From Swiss-Prot:
Pathway info: Amino-acid biosynthesis; L-histidine biosynthesis; L-histidine from 5-phospho-alpha-D-ribose 1-diphosphate: step 4/9; Amino-acid biosynthesis; L-tryptophan biosynthesis; L-tryptophan from chorismate: step 3/5
Function: Involved in both the histidine and tryptophan biosynthetic pathways.
Keywords, sorted A to Z: Amino-acid biosynthesis, Aromatic amino acid biosynthesis, Cytoplasm, Histidine biosynthesis, Isomerase, Tryptophan biosynthesis
UniProt GO BP: L-histidine biosynthetic process; L-tryptophan biosynthetic process
A GO cellular component annotation in the UniProt record: cytoplasm
Top-level class of the enzyme under EC nomenclature: isomerase
Name of the gene this protein is made from: priA
Stated name of the protein: Phosphoribosyl isomerase A
EC number: 5.3.1.16, 5.3.1.24
Reaction(s) the record says it catalyses: 1-(5-phospho-beta-D-ribosyl)-5-[(5-phospho-beta-D-ribosylamino)methylideneamino]imidazole-4-carboxamide = 5-[(5-phospho-1-deoxy-D-ribulos-1-ylimino)methylamino]-1-(5-phospho-beta-D-ribosyl)imidazole-4-carboxamide; N-(5-phospho-beta-D-ribosyl)anthranilate = 1-(2-carboxyphenylamino)-1-deoxy-D-ribulose 5-phosphate
Protein backbone atom coordinates (compact mmCIF):
# COMPACT_ATOMS: atom_id res chain seq x y z
CA UNK A 1 0.00 0.00 0.00
CA UNK A 2 1.44 3.35 -1.02
CA UNK A 3 0.77 6.32 1.20
CA UNK A 4 1.90 9.89 1.60
CA UNK A 5 3.42 10.87 4.90
CA UNK A 6 2.52 14.47 5.79
CA UNK A 7 5.69 14.75 7.86
CA UNK A 8 7.96 13.45 5.10
CA UNK A 9 11.14 15.43 4.55
CA UNK A 10 10.64 15.15 0.80
CA UNK A 11 8.85 18.33 -0.32
CA UNK A 12 7.72 16.73 -3.59
CA UNK A 13 5.15 14.43 -1.98
CA UNK A 14 1.68 15.89 -2.49
CA UNK A 15 -0.76 15.07 0.33
CA UNK A 16 -4.08 13.73 -0.97
CA UNK A 17 -7.31 14.38 0.92
CA UNK A 18 -10.25 12.32 -0.37
CA UNK A 19 -13.44 14.33 0.13
CA UNK A 20 -16.56 13.15 1.91
CA UNK A 21 -19.30 15.76 1.43
CA UNK A 22 -22.31 15.02 3.62
CA UNK A 23 -26.00 15.79 3.01
CA UNK A 24 -28.52 14.23 5.41
CA UNK A 25 -25.97 11.63 6.45
CA UNK A 26 -25.10 10.54 2.92
CA UNK A 27 -21.92 11.09 0.93
CA UNK A 28 -22.65 13.23 -2.13
CA UNK A 29 -20.86 15.25 -4.79
CA UNK A 30 -22.13 18.55 -6.16
CA UNK A 31 -21.48 20.23 -9.50
CA UNK A 32 -20.01 23.72 -8.98
CA UNK A 33 -21.33 23.68 -5.43
CA UNK A 34 -24.95 23.99 -6.53
CA UNK A 35 -27.57 22.76 -4.08
CA UNK A 36 -29.75 20.26 -5.89
CA UNK A 37 -26.93 18.98 -8.11
CA UNK A 38 -26.08 16.13 -5.74
CA UNK A 39 -25.08 12.68 -6.87
CA UNK A 40 -25.35 10.30 -3.91
CA UNK A 41 -22.65 7.77 -3.08
CA UNK A 42 -24.02 6.04 0.03
CA UNK A 43 -23.21 6.31 3.71
CA UNK A 44 -20.75 9.03 4.74
CA UNK A 45 -19.12 6.69 7.24
CA UNK A 46 -18.72 3.93 4.64
CA UNK A 47 -17.14 6.39 2.21
CA UNK A 48 -14.67 7.66 4.80
CA UNK A 49 -13.73 4.15 5.90
CA UNK A 50 -13.19 3.16 2.27
CA UNK A 51 -10.67 5.96 1.74
CA UNK A 52 -8.89 5.07 4.97
CA UNK A 53 -8.69 1.43 3.90
CA UNK A 54 -7.30 2.48 0.52
CA UNK A 55 -4.39 4.35 2.08
CA UNK A 56 -5.53 7.91 2.79
CA UNK A 57 -3.75 9.68 5.63
CA UNK A 58 -6.18 12.62 5.52
CA UNK A 59 -9.92 12.90 4.89
CA UNK A 60 -11.64 16.18 3.92
CA UNK A 61 -15.04 15.90 5.65
CA UNK A 62 -17.67 18.51 4.81
CA UNK A 63 -21.10 19.16 6.33
CA UNK A 64 -22.90 20.58 3.30
CA UNK A 65 -26.17 21.02 5.18
CA UNK A 66 -24.39 23.28 7.67
CA UNK A 67 -22.55 25.09 4.87
CA UNK A 68 -25.86 25.92 3.18
CA UNK A 69 -27.45 26.87 6.52
CA UNK A 70 -30.18 24.24 6.26
CA UNK A 71 -29.35 22.00 9.23
CA UNK A 72 -26.36 19.99 10.32
CA UNK A 73 -24.83 16.52 10.51
CA UNK A 74 -22.85 17.39 13.65
CA UNK A 75 -23.41 14.13 15.55
CA UNK A 76 -22.72 11.98 12.51
CA UNK A 77 -19.51 13.84 11.68
CA UNK A 78 -18.31 13.39 15.26
CA UNK A 79 -19.02 9.67 14.91
CA UNK A 80 -17.11 9.48 11.62
CA UNK A 81 -14.08 11.29 13.04
CA UNK A 82 -14.15 9.03 16.10
CA UNK A 83 -14.11 5.86 14.01
CA UNK A 84 -11.29 6.94 11.71
CA UNK A 85 -7.61 6.39 12.50
CA UNK A 86 -6.47 9.05 10.04
CA UNK A 87 -6.38 12.83 10.23
CA UNK A 88 -9.58 14.69 9.36
CA UNK A 89 -10.00 18.21 8.02
CA UNK A 90 -13.54 19.23 9.04
CA UNK A 91 -15.43 21.87 7.10
CA UNK A 92 -18.90 23.32 6.64
CA UNK A 93 -20.87 25.81 8.71
CA UNK A 94 -18.12 26.62 11.23
CA UNK A 95 -19.06 30.25 11.78
CA UNK A 96 -19.20 30.93 15.54
CA UNK A 97 -17.85 29.78 18.91
CA UNK A 98 -20.47 27.04 19.26
CA UNK A 99 -19.90 25.42 15.87
CA UNK A 100 -16.11 25.79 16.24
CA UNK A 101 -16.11 24.15 19.67
CA UNK A 102 -18.26 21.29 18.37
CA UNK A 103 -15.93 20.78 15.40
CA UNK A 104 -12.77 20.78 17.51
CA UNK A 105 -14.41 18.47 20.08
CA UNK A 106 -14.70 15.74 17.43
CA UNK A 107 -10.95 15.27 17.64
CA UNK A 108 -10.39 16.35 14.05
CA UNK A 109 -6.85 17.40 13.16
CA UNK A 110 -7.94 20.65 11.57
CA UNK A 111 -11.02 22.77 10.91
CA UNK A 112 -11.64 24.72 7.75
CA UNK A 113 -13.34 28.11 8.07
CA UNK A 114 -15.21 29.49 5.08
CA UNK A 115 -17.99 32.02 5.33
CA UNK A 116 -16.85 33.14 8.79
CA UNK A 117 -13.63 34.51 7.37
CA UNK A 118 -15.64 36.69 5.00
CA UNK A 119 -18.58 37.75 7.17
CA UNK A 120 -16.91 38.00 10.58
CA UNK A 121 -13.26 38.97 10.09
CA UNK A 122 -12.67 39.87 13.75
CA UNK A 123 -13.90 36.49 14.98
CA UNK A 124 -11.85 34.73 12.32
CA UNK A 125 -8.70 36.61 13.36
CA UNK A 126 -9.31 35.61 16.99
CA UNK A 127 -9.75 31.95 16.05
CA UNK A 128 -6.61 31.93 13.90
CA UNK A 129 -4.62 33.50 16.75
CA UNK A 130 -5.97 31.06 19.35
CA UNK A 131 -5.82 27.81 17.41
CA UNK A 132 -2.94 28.28 14.96
CA UNK A 133 -2.25 25.22 12.85
CA UNK A 134 -5.60 23.62 13.74
CA UNK A 135 -7.36 26.23 11.59
CA UNK A 136 -7.30 26.56 7.81
CA UNK A 137 -9.33 29.06 5.81
CA UNK A 138 -11.20 28.06 2.68
CA UNK A 139 -10.95 30.50 -0.21
CA UNK A 140 -13.76 29.62 -2.62
CA UNK A 141 -13.09 31.62 -5.76
CA UNK A 142 -15.28 32.50 -8.71
CA UNK A 143 -13.67 34.46 -11.52
CA UNK A 144 -16.22 36.96 -12.85
CA UNK A 145 -15.28 39.32 -15.68
CA UNK A 146 -11.63 38.86 -14.82
CA UNK A 147 -12.22 39.63 -11.14
CA UNK A 148 -11.35 37.03 -8.50
CA UNK A 149 -14.38 37.06 -6.18
CA UNK A 150 -14.84 34.98 -3.04
CA UNK A 151 -18.04 33.04 -2.46
CA UNK A 152 -19.68 32.37 0.92
CA UNK A 153 -22.57 30.42 2.47
CA UNK A 154 -22.36 27.38 0.24
CA UNK A 155 -21.08 29.60 -2.57
CA UNK A 156 -24.35 31.54 -2.77
CA UNK A 157 -23.11 35.00 -1.68
CA UNK A 158 -20.29 37.31 -2.74
CA UNK A 159 -17.51 37.57 -0.17
CA UNK A 160 -15.32 40.26 -1.65
CA UNK A 161 -12.05 40.41 -3.55
CA UNK A 162 -9.80 37.36 -3.19
CA UNK A 163 -6.54 39.28 -3.03
CA UNK A 164 -7.75 41.77 -0.44
CA UNK A 165 -9.05 39.01 1.83
CA UNK A 166 -5.97 36.82 1.30
CA UNK A 167 -3.63 39.66 2.23
CA UNK A 168 -5.66 40.33 5.39
CA UNK A 169 -5.73 36.70 6.48
CA UNK A 170 -2.06 36.23 5.66
CA UNK A 171 -1.21 39.26 7.78
CA UNK A 172 -3.22 37.78 10.65
CA UNK A 173 -1.12 34.63 10.54
CA UNK A 174 -3.48 32.14 8.91
CA UNK A 175 -1.55 28.87 8.79
CA UNK A 176 -3.08 27.30 5.68
CA UNK A 177 -5.45 28.06 2.80
CA UNK A 178 -7.77 25.66 0.97
CA UNK A 179 -8.26 27.13 -2.50
CA UNK A 180 -11.23 26.13 -4.67
CA UNK A 181 -12.18 27.42 -8.10
CA UNK A 182 -15.92 26.94 -7.74
CA UNK A 183 -16.44 26.85 -11.51
CA UNK A 184 -14.24 23.73 -11.57
CA UNK A 185 -15.53 21.86 -8.52
CA UNK A 186 -17.35 18.64 -9.35
CA UNK A 187 -16.94 19.18 -13.09
CA UNK A 188 -13.96 16.89 -13.79
CA UNK A 189 -12.63 19.68 -16.03
CA UNK A 190 -9.16 19.95 -14.53
CA UNK A 191 -7.74 22.15 -11.76
CA UNK A 192 -7.01 25.86 -12.06
CA UNK A 193 -3.21 25.75 -11.87
CA UNK A 194 -2.88 29.46 -12.62
CA UNK A 195 -5.05 30.38 -9.63
CA UNK A 196 -3.06 28.08 -7.34
CA UNK A 197 0.21 29.59 -8.54
CA UNK A 198 -1.07 33.14 -8.03
CA UNK A 199 -2.20 32.38 -4.48
CA UNK A 200 1.15 30.78 -3.64
CA UNK A 201 2.90 33.91 -4.88
CA UNK A 202 0.93 36.00 -2.37
CA UNK A 203 1.47 33.91 0.77
CA UNK A 204 4.09 31.73 2.41
CA UNK A 205 1.37 29.63 4.06
CA UNK A 206 0.83 26.17 2.56
CA UNK A 207 -2.03 25.81 0.08
CA UNK A 208 -4.43 22.90 -0.40
CA UNK A 209 -5.82 22.65 -3.94
CA UNK A 210 -9.49 21.79 -4.45
CA UNK A 211 -11.75 21.46 -7.46
CA UNK A 212 -11.61 19.99 -10.94
CA UNK A 213 -9.25 17.02 -10.54
CA UNK A 214 -10.25 14.50 -13.19
CA UNK A 215 -7.17 12.37 -13.88
CA UNK A 216 -3.84 11.21 -12.54
CA UNK A 217 -2.22 13.74 -14.87
CA UNK A 218 -4.16 16.51 -13.10
CA UNK A 219 -2.70 15.34 -9.80
CA UNK A 220 0.78 15.17 -11.29
CA UNK A 221 0.34 18.73 -12.55
CA UNK A 222 -0.65 19.94 -9.08
CA UNK A 223 2.31 18.03 -7.63
CA UNK A 224 4.66 20.17 -9.75
CA UNK A 225 3.56 23.13 -7.62
CA UNK A 226 4.74 21.69 -4.29
CA UNK A 227 7.93 23.75 -4.48
CA UNK A 228 5.73 26.85 -4.89
CA UNK A 229 3.76 26.09 -1.73
CA UNK A 230 0.97 23.69 -2.72
CA UNK A 231 0.93 21.11 0.07
CA UNK A 232 -2.01 18.92 -0.85
CA UNK A 233 -5.00 18.29 -3.08
CA UNK A 234 -8.60 17.45 -2.23
CA UNK A 235 -9.98 14.78 -4.55
CA UNK A 236 -13.68 14.09 -4.78
CA UNK A 237 -15.74 13.29 -7.82
CA UNK A 238 -12.90 11.67 -9.77
CA UNK A 239 -12.54 9.01 -7.06
CA UNK A 240 -16.28 8.45 -6.71
CA UNK A 241 -16.73 8.27 -10.49
CA UNK A 242 -13.94 5.72 -10.82
CA UNK A 243 -11.59 7.84 -12.94
CA UNK A 244 -8.77 6.34 -10.86
CA UNK A 245 -8.35 4.60 -7.51
CA UNK A 246 -6.87 6.18 -4.42
CA UNK A 247 -3.87 3.79 -4.41
CA UNK A 248 -3.18 4.80 -8.02
CA UNK A 249 -3.39 8.47 -7.05
CA UNK A 250 -1.08 8.03 -4.06
CA UNK A 251 1.40 6.20 -6.27
CA UNK A 252 1.25 8.96 -8.91
CA UNK A 253 2.21 11.75 -6.51
CA UNK A 254 4.22 9.82 -3.92
CA UNK A 255 7.92 10.28 -3.24
Amino acid sequence: MTSVNPSSSKPSALILLPAVDVVEGRAVRLVQGQAGSETEYGSALDAAMTWQRDGAEWIHLVDLDAAFGRGSNRELLAEVVGKLDVAVELSGGIRDDDSLAAALATGCARVNLGTAALENPQWCAKVVAEHGDKVAVGLDVKIVDGQHRLRGRGWETDGGDLWTVLDRLDGEGCSRFVVTDVTKDGTLNGPNLELLTQVCERTDAPVIASGGVSSLDDLRAIATLTDRGVEGAIVGKALYAGRFTLPQALDAVGP
